[in-house]
């Protein structure tokens, strides 16, 4: 096939230049329109924190530094003597959800584009700065707390940086959370003055059922 040879190229035709405005910059943030979306966002950040290598390393350090081997309520439940005992680290007086929500408020109020990893990173760093309160609990005690059955005094918690946290994030703590904190401080002082608190909820309690129409074997007295 013979190649076509162009003897002369004429580019003298009329040119038209079109001016286009600079494209609008689109931030990489997330918009939370409903309370449901906000809650989902916070829980996702929580998951990122708990599953991160940095958080796991911190919890390991926390347990080692404070020589944690037992539940703060049941000291006889010791991981050294009982292999099946599992301790969970509880956040108090602000839960991990509360802390994440407060950090989220900071980003929203300062027009910082929302990003899961950015917020999770800040929450994790607060742990390393010892600005969150932590306490070791057995699984049962931890569950009872979240059911509202027991109260954890602030003085029982590792809260060295709590005051610093409140001062730094005061503008971002919801008013209802501030009210709860004030009430917790009040109750903690009362417990400290009394020297103890009612832990009867943690004692054994047997429930016997009497079902109409059913006959149960009687215990034979010796």
Regions found by a protein language model. Name each.
Residues 112-119, 123-157:
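Short Cys/His-centered divalent metal-binding micro-motifs
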Residues 6-47, 143-222:
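C-terminal/domain-terminus segments
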Residues 51-54, 114, 138, 174:
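Short, structured coil/loop segments at alpha-helix boundaries
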Residues 2:
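BZIP DNA-binding basic region
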Residues 55-110, 138-140:
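Short cysteine-rich loop/turn motifs with clustered Cys
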Residues 102-126, 167-189:
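Short Fe-S-cluster ligation motifs
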Residues 87-92, 132-141, 191, 198-200:
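Extended, compositionally biased low-complexity polar/Lys-Gly-rich tracts
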Residues 47-60, 116-123:
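Short Cys/His-rich Zn2+-coordinating modules
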């Amino acid at each position: 096939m013979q190649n076509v040879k162009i003897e002369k190229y004429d580019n003298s035709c009329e040119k038209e230049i079109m001016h286009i405005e600079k494209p609008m910059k689109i931030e990489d943030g997330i918009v939370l329109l409903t309370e449901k979306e906000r809650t989902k966002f916070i829980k996702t950040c929580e998951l990122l924190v708990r599953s991160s290598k940095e958080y796991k390393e911190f919890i390991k350090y926390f347990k080692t530094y404070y020589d944690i081997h037992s539940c703060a309520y049941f000291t006889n439940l010791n991981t050294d003597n009982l292999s099946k005992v599992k301790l969970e680290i509880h956040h108090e007086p602000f839960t991990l959800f509360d802390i994440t929500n407060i950090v989220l408020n900071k980003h929203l109020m300062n027009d910082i584009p929302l990003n899961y990893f950015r917020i999770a990173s800040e929450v994790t760093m607060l742990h390393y700065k010892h600005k969150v309160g932590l306490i070791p609990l057995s699984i049962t005690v931890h569950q009872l707390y979240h059911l509202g059955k027991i109260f954890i005094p602030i003085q029982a918690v590792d809260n060295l940086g709590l005051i610093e946290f409140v001062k730094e994030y005061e503008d971002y703590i919801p008013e209802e959370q501030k009210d709860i904190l004030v009430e917790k401080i009040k109750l903690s002082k009362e417990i400290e003055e009394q020297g103890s608190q009612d832990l009867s909820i943690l004692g054994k309690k047997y429930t016997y059922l009497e079902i109409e129409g059913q006959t149960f074997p009687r215990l034979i007295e010796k």
